[in-house]
Design a protein with these regions (language model features):
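Active-site-adjacent pocket-lining segments in enzyme domains
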Residues: 2, 8, 15-34, 49-94, ...
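Lipid deacylating catalytic domains
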Residues: 37
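Short gly/ser/thr-rich secondary-structure transition/capping motifs
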Residues: 42-50
Length: 193
């Protein structure tokens, strides 16, 4: 798992109490095919909160799929099946980097505008991908309840996810994006107002 790709979205959710006068609507849970520890690409060990079979999908706002070189594993097919069910049930699905390749292999990208590391990446590594006409060359693409991003698009991906979930006002989301993309303190002040 590429933990660097989910840093901004985790930061945005962790700030919710601070930015919403003490209220918190969203809780992040880590989910995997089982509860075995996962070694990330950066060398961190993450212990999932729950297995995919334990998730109550009637009570989630989003399923976010980080990049990973392990998406091709048979173990992850249940997660991809759940992603497809989420999309059918108007639950937001976010996929970045290698997770977009997994969605391509599963046929999901054949029905949504999307992006990935490149069109060539999807064509080369996926034998089943047929969504070429829906590919958009951008860091992040939001279409209905699917948000996809390339490996360099984690900040834009975060912005699109926050807007889709209405976590914050557009003004706060823009301040978050502008602060983390420029480092300009005026946007941090706007974020805290």
């Amino acid at each position: 798992m590429a933990e660097c790709e989910i840093g901004y979205i985790l930061q945005a959710f962790s700030m919710e109490k601070l930015l919403k006068d003490g209220t918190k609507e969203f809780e992040v849970k880590t989910v995997a095919c089982n509860k075995k520890p996962i070694l990330t690409l950066g060398g961190l060990t993450i212990i999932p909160d729950c297995a995919i079979s334990e998730v109550d999908f009637s009570n989630i706002a989003a399923l976010l799929l980080p990049g990973s070189s392990a998406w091709g594993s048979e173990d992850n097919q249940e997660i991809l099946k759940k992603a497809q069910e989420c999309l059918r049930n108007d639950i937001l699905v976010g996929a970045i980097c290698g997770a977009t390749l997994a969605l391509a292999d599963y046929g999901i990208l054949d029905r949504f505008k999307h992006t990935s590391n490149s069109l060539e990446y999807l064509n080369f590594f996926s034998k089943k991908y047929a969504g070429q006409d829906l590919y958009v060359c951008s860091n992040s693409v939001s279409d209905r309840n699917l948000v996809t991003a390339n490996s360099a698009g984690s900040l834009e991906w975060t912005k699109d996810i926050l807007k889709n979930l209405n976590v914050y006002s557009d003004k706060k989301i823009d301040a978050f994006y502008n602060y983390y993309s420029t480092g300009n303190a005026k946007y941090y002040d706007e974020l805290l107002q």
